[in-house]
Amino acid sequence: IIKIENKSEINPRIEHICILGSLRDRFENLRKLLAAEQPKRAIVFVNNNTELRQINEKLQYHKVKSTAIYGNASKEERQRALDSFRRGKCNVLVSSDLSARGLDIPEVSHIISLDFPVNPDEYLHRAGRTARGDNSGVSVCLITNKDIEILQSYEKAFGIEFTVKKLYGGK
């Protein structure tokens, strides 16, 4: 059981969605989600740098205009990736929670948690990267059966409801 001490506010202009699937299908579900939603700008959160790099490379292989910021990236590499994302040269930024701290990028339409955040503060931080100003936004979590209990605790604690969506099984 996860206990959340203080009830933090989540922007009411954020739509919360979860997509239930297996760990094995995570990348394919991400790819299908990006193709279906066609986000103006999306940040994809991944929990570790090795996987982060692999996800970015796979997205690029599938012709998704993506870039990544790594925890161990140089200041120049980080700035180059952020500039590319801000200027619209790419519309998907793959990042870890730590790398995304303090980012203020306008017009991020979608937040996608490839790894479900097991800490409520992480979810608040991730979701808070979208729906800035007067904009609305979407926060999508790709989850497995083991994440459902945590997701339900977030719904209760934050007073939100996740819409469960299915992705088409074909290509």
Give residue spans per PLM region.
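Conserved helicase RecA-like core
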Residues: 1-171
